[in-house]
């Protein structure tokens, strides 16, 4: 989830001046996101019914999953052999599940960076759309 959830959280905080209604959601979602509980973002933003965010959410998982598989197959990351609780924070999960391989934690940060790059144009389009909605509502009022 680090490749698709954390970029959304980062962009939510970065956009808090243009879209002030996202900051409280980000503050509420942050503690649970540390432990891989992303429902506040999935249904609060919402990602689920939002074409701007659903497309990169799915795309990011496909790309980072394939990359992680490839990095494991070439030996950069040790094979995952520990079954840890799903709520373990992501960098720690990567490190421990790979048997203490630092490569496991490094891959988590690589996946996060890839998620940031993939989400950027989609987030900008979402942000622009939301700003236009807010301006239209202000004109009506």
Task: Name each model-derived stretch.
Residues 42-141:
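Transmembrane alpha-helical segments and their short flanking loops
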